[in-house]
Amino acid sequence: MTMTAMLSAIAFVLMMLEFSIPIMPSFIKLDFSELPALIGSFAMGPLSGTVICLIKNLLHLPMSSTGGVGELSNFILGAMFVIPAGLFYKKRKGRKSALIGSLVGAVLMSVVSVASNYFIVYPVYTAFMPMEAIINAYQVILPQADTLLKCLVIFNMPFTFAKGMMNVLITFLVYKHISLSLIHI
């Protein structure tokens, strides 16, 4: 429990350190808050990784400007990422299993991001910003992105996959160095 709490707190702090990507609409942000959840999923199993995703989003809720819908989507996508990674690693501990599970998780997270944004996030956002304005933000970068689905497939899906892979890379660089310390907490 202590390790889950500690990793959740780190994930929350990392969630607060989000930043914009120049080639994306300004409302799409990058953070590395899935990193502690992925580490937790490897160290303690997929349930712990999922709990870390849940706690960081619950902690972020009072500061949210999305009415909770962004946190719901972040939780769903984070769980889609850490569950397969943790399951693969739990079944057969090793770098290859961790890599395969992480790749499956990153692909699943990116595919689910399209559905999550299409059916949950953007319909709620249209209460504050017309759909036309949302699509126009994408069209500034790529004029051919003329429907929400095209925007999500062209921009959000690869962005989400890349975000997942960055988390995987960092995890692979640090996991062995910190895993022994985590066990003793």
Predicted feature residues:
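Loop-helix junctions at membrane interfaces
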Residues: M1-I183
